[in-house]
Regions:
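NAD(P)-cofactor binding segment of oxidoreductase domains
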Residues: 55, 69-97
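Catalytic helix-loop patch of NAD(P)-dependent Rossmann-fold dehydrogenases
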Residues: 76, 81-84, 91, 104-146, ...
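Adenosine-cofactor binding site in Rossmann-like domains, unifying the SAM/SAH pocket
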Residues: 21-45
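SDR active-site strand-loop-helix element
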Residues: 6, 30, 55-59, 96-101, ...
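NAD(P)H-binding glycine-rich loop region in Rossmannoid oxidoreductase-like domains
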Residues: 40-77
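NAD(P)-dependent short-chain dehydrogenase/reductase
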Residues: 134-182
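Conserved catalytic-core motifs of eukaryotic protein kinase domains, centered on the activation segment
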Residues: 65-72, 107-111, 156-157
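N-terminal Rossmann NAD(P)H-binding glycine-rich loop of SDR-like oxidoreductase domains
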Residues: 2-22
Length: 185
């Protein structure tokens, strides 16, 4: 299967391409240098040229705190960029996987989130990822939305790497203990 992956320079996109290749799939990874997802023409041209069987959309504006001061940029990437990809996937009848986030929920759950739980984002990042989910739902019938949290892996920046370093340097680390989540490797 030929799979087109956005956000290949990011932690998740990089690892997705690696995993696809290990499993014998042809992975085509792109980042903003090759395809600016906020530019509908760029998205159309690059995906048509690649002619994939499926798209895994990992590219995103993920700076949660900075998003509060950058609503329009965050929206252009997470909502409009996602819609650009969804439209091309619809036109070419390509299956799409959208990587979303638990930030689409309000954080007040007392049990693990279910796919159909009410989405009620509390911040700009969550709002724009929710808008991306809506763009997928309104444009496609062949799609999967995967909501992830606390991403870690071999590549990129993540919580695990500094904790391991601090543990080696100090022998112990203090962290918040009032959060519940589902780490994604």
């Amino acid at each position: 299967m030929k799979v087109f992956v956005t956000g290949v320079k990011g932690q998740l996109g990089h690892d997705v391409v690696d995993e696809l290749e290990k499993r014998g799939h042809e992975a085509i990874g792109v980042d903003i240098d090759e395809m600016d997802i906020t530019d509908a023409g760029s998205v159309d041209r690059v995906i048509r040229e690649a002619s994939p069987d499926a798209v895994i959309h990992c590219a995103a504006y993920t700076a949660v705190d900075a998003a509060e001061d950058n609503l329009e940029l965050c929206r252009r990437v997470n909502a409009y960029g996602t819609e650009n990809i969804a439209r091309v996937c619809r036109e070419l009848d390509i299956k799409m996987m959208y990587i979303s986030t638990d930030y689409v929920f309000n954080g007040q759950g007392t049990r693990p989130w279910e796919p159909d739980d009410e989405r009620e984002p509390l911040n700009v990042y969550g709002l724009t990822k929710y808008e991306g989910e809506l763009a997928i739902e309104q444009n496609l019938t062949k799609y999967f939305t995967v909501r992830i949290a606390w991403v870690f892996g071999v590549n990129g920046k993540n919580f695990i790497k500094p904790m391991l370093r601090i543990g080696k340097e100090r022998g112990a680390a203090s962290v918040v203990d009032d959060q519940i989540g589902s780490p994604t490797y």
